Each structure stands twice: as structure tokens, then as C-alpha cells.
């Protein structure tokens, strides 16, 4: 019991006295703008002055307006869906074209490598062929000189 009294005394320590409310009437009116309820506005309910038939008609109009908004939203969603489908088709077509291009680039790269190897081989052979032809030419000249020397 002593613990409970200690809790109550700590809980009420912000009050001037335990019998006084936290806020004076003036402070409460200033805070809540003169309303007798803690939350919200007293005029929140638009149906207070309407008859049952009027409430029904108002709710029916509200529902019709909401249906129109939902129809417009549905149309917008359908257009977004159609656009997304078109984008998907275009992206798929471009992906296919890129795949085909990749295959062509790979085959062209392989042919370029082969051609480069062939050119390197040809260049090396042409260097050797030049030496062989020079040797043959010099042997021919030597042979001509030997023949001319033997004749004279």
C-alpha cells in the first residue's frame, strides 16, 4: 500500500494540489478554442441537421462521385499498364537485336584475329622471301662473273 501511495504522490507531483485540474478553465478554453471536447471540432458531423432521406441522398452522391473518381483512376491505371506493356515489348525487341549484334561482333572479331594472324605470317614470310631472292640474285651474278672470267 505504501508503494501505491508513493506512485500516486509522484504522479500528482505536477499539480498544485491533487484536487485542482492540470489546466485552468481559461487555459483549457485557449488551448481547445472554447470547445467542450478534448479532440476535434464540434461541427465535424455534417449529418447532424439532415433528415434520414437527406443523409441517404448525400451518401449516394458521395458514392457516385467516388465511383467517377475510381473510373478515372482505373482508366489511368489501364493507360499506365498499356505503356508498360509497350515498353516491355520494345525492350525485348532491343534485347534480341543486341544479342544478334553481339553474335555478329563476336564472329567479326574472330575473323579479324584470323586475318591479323595471316598478315603477321605473310609479313614474316615476305621478309624471308626477300633474303632468298637476294641470295639467288647474288649467286646468279657470281655465276655470270665466273663464266666471263673463264671466257676471257
Curated annotation (Swiss-Prot):
Its main location: membrane. Involved in the targeting and/or fusion of transport vesicles to their target membrane during transport of proteins from the early endosome to the lysosome. Required for fusion of late endosomes with lysosomes and homotypic lysosomal fusion. Component of the SNARE complex composed of syn7A, syn8A, vamp7A and vti1A. The keyword Cell inner membrane does not apply. Residues 1-131 are cytoplasmic. This is Syntaxin-8A. The chain crosses the membrane at residues 132-152. GO terms for cellular component: endosome; endosome membrane; SNARE complex. It is a single-pass membrane protein. One of its GO terms (biological process) is vesicle fusion. It is found in: Endosome membrane. SUPFAM superfamilies: SNARE fusion complex (SSF58038). Residues 1-22 are annotated as: Disordered. Belongs to the syntaxin family. InterPro entries: T_SNARE_dom.
